[in-house]
């Protein structure tokens, strides 16, 4: 039974092959059929017909394309007087062709364009610039994507949507480079403390960045809250207020609590010099804030209390 099935299945294969051969043979016959009318030869074809045969006999190993290149270069070097007999012969052949085939019309055959190697491996949509190295461009794209991802994460940490950080930065004049803030936050913390405690707040975005960027800074900032408020209200009670122990922050939730809009404005206004506060009080407040900042950086605070060496 299996032998019968094998004999039944075997014959169609050669039939298909013969059918394919017949199709290819019919295509070749249609191309080389005598019914197909060829174009009349131009002057270059008339001249190169004898020259091609001669050059092929002299160089039997030379490819036909190389022969055509050399013949084209030689034809361009010929003068008009040398080309004249071949031009006349081409005109005669064309007139004869029009007499024999009055209804002839040239119909160029569409050739399928083969993709070159460089076209096969280029990115779709022309992403690579002309002459660009695919390897280097891929590395640059991956680095750019990583930076954008870090920036998006940093924006979400601050509670802004994608793109909001850039708008706040442009409108409020944030002085720090955005590419450094997310990547080099630990190295830039001392500079943040100096800019915030010793100077005034430039913008709401910078204050929110500082509050969310570093938990250690948030603790030191909240510890400065009580002396700062006492200095903002009256400059004469500095010593009595600073002698009391400030509150100790024990969790990250407490450090993130002052990030509300109203509290943030109060803390910003606390550091701004008021009209009723005299200038010596403002200078002493600046000195105290610098002292607390240096103490928090050096790690001299013990059990959440601040030293009283400034008294």
From Swiss-Prot:
UniProt motif (9aaTAD) ranges: 266-274
DNA-binding region: 37-105
Gene Ontology MF terms in the entry: chromatin binding; DNA-binding transcription factor activity; sequence-specific DNA binding
Claim: Transcription is one of the keywords in the record: yes
Pfam families to which the protein is assigned, alphabetical: HMG_box, SOXp
Keyword Lipid biosynthesis: no
Entry-linked InterPro entries: HMG_box_dom, HMG_box_dom_sf, SOX_fam, SRY-related_HMG-box_TF-like
Region (Disordered): 1-40, 232-259
CDD domains assigned to the protein according to its UniProt record, in alphabetical order: HMG-box_SoxB (cd01388)
GO biological process terms held by the UniProt record: cell population proliferation; epithalamus development; eye morphogenesis; fin regeneration; inner ear receptor cell development; nervous system development; otic placode development; otic vesicle development
Subcellular location: Nucleus
Gene3D superfamilies found in the cross-reference section: High mobility group box domain
Superkingdom of the source species: Eukaryota
Role summary: Transcriptional activator. Functions as a switch in neuronal development, participating in the differentiation of embryonic neuroectodermal cells into neural tissues by making the ectodermal cells responsive to FGF-neuralizing signals. Downstream SRRT target that mediates the promotion of neural stem cell self-renewal.
Name of this protein: Transcription factor Sox-2
Lineage: Eukaryota, Metazoa, Chordata, Craniata, Vertebrata
